[in-house]
Amino acid sequence: MHTAVAEYNQKINTNYRWNFFWMALDNMMFFFIFMGMSPYTILPYYVEKFTDSKILIGLIPTLYLVGTTLPQLVMANFLHSRKKRKKYLVAIAATQRMGILGVFLLSLLQPRFNISATLTLVIFFLMHTLQHVASGFYVPAWIDFLGKCIPRRRGFLFGISNFLGGLMGLALGWLLAFLLERYPFQQAMPVIFGIALGASLISLVSIISWREVVPPDELLPREADRTDSLGGVFKDRNFVQYLIWRGLMVTLEIATPFYALSALEILRVSAAQVGVFTTILAFSQAAMNPLWGWLGDKKGFLRIIQISALAGSLGAFLAVLVPTLPSYYAVFFLVGMMLSGLSISSINIIFEFSPKQLVPLYTAVSQIALTPLSSVVPLLGGVVAEQLGYAANYWLAGALGLASLLGISAAVKNPKGHSGEELKAA
């Protein structure tokens, strides 16, 4: 037993730098994909050209959140007894790219064949759903692979790759602004979506390049413990408290799809400002990610979640209290802080809460627990914005964001340093 485990750990260390590089490259490409297909700026701007419904605008981040959430428990159970998992990662990643390809082809063919607005929206939402449902199956396998192949300095990996990806994303943000300013909508959007597609293919090459080390039987969870393990997750009181307050924090998403649209509508600025907003969003993420990675490794990722909630709440209040263009620039910087902080923390905090062998299960439970709010919040935001206006939307987001910050600060103990120690929190 000890020999097999020692050989496994040796292979992990041998492949550590190789996997670190390719995982970092994959994560860097995420910035290009996310900027070119942002559910908070680019996609709402695209869909708005075909509908006046703010509810449909709110559906964009809803499908993004729900699609990446609901399949995770299914995938975690599927992976439970499977030793070789990389092949599933590659197959699902390829499916994700089919959704991105579909949106790209739609933007290219819609003006050429004069496809109706209704059919355009149907095809768009089908492709958008395909991409993010595939992401829901992908995430547990990816996090499990990450936890095994990168056993140390994960915060540094995310920090440095997000930083470099964000810097390159600044150039992309400038390009987005240039395209939207100088070229008609129907010419600019295929280029933007094409860049996202190209980045996704580089990401796919990175995923294929990862080296899987198959664990020995001794390190696999026993089938007899499967049901008990799921029950044990819910007996982890600290983790449950985290899920409750982190779930409320999702309400910050009520505002994010509408910041760019409200700026265009209220301030009467040009469409090129969507590219500027996206650039600021990328710059904020690039600037903050190294700090998040360092702080998470040192102090724990709960601290980053708290700071992110504060940034998101301040952004919402600023948008409603000081509706000027410079203020909106600050709003998007704060939103970038929030999104990057929550993104890097939502993954890495699982390793702090979970015993090593239960990471996919903890991941799935975490995401499933956040689904009810994450599924309705952007749609609720669309209803509020349509019926009561953007201001009511932003007041609600800011107030609930602050409430979640106070709750998580009071009720959740920092799990840093206690990974795998116990399932029940004191």
Functional labels for PLM-detected ranges:
Residues K54-I55, K86, P151-S161, A271, ...:
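Loop-to-transmembrane helix entry/capping segments in MFS-fold secondary transporters
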Residues L105-M127, V320-F332:
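Helix-loop junctions at membrane interfaces in 12-TM secondary transporters
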Residues H2-L70, L79, Q96, N238-T278:
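Helix-loop boundary and gating motifs at the non-cytosolic
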Residues K87-V103, G194, R303-L318:
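Structural signature of the two symmetry-related core transmembrane helices
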Residues S135-I150, G341-P355:
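Intracellular juxtamembrane helix-capping segments at the cytosolic ends
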Residues P71-K84, L180-E181, M288-G300, A385:
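Helix-to-loop junctions at the C-terminal end of transmembrane segments
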Residues H2-R17, V213-I244, L423-A426:
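Juxtamembrane intracellular "pre-TM" segments in multi-pass secondary transporters
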Residues P44, K49, N77-S81, F104-F113, ...:
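Transmembrane alpha-helix termini and helix-breaking/packing motifs in multi-pass membrane transporters
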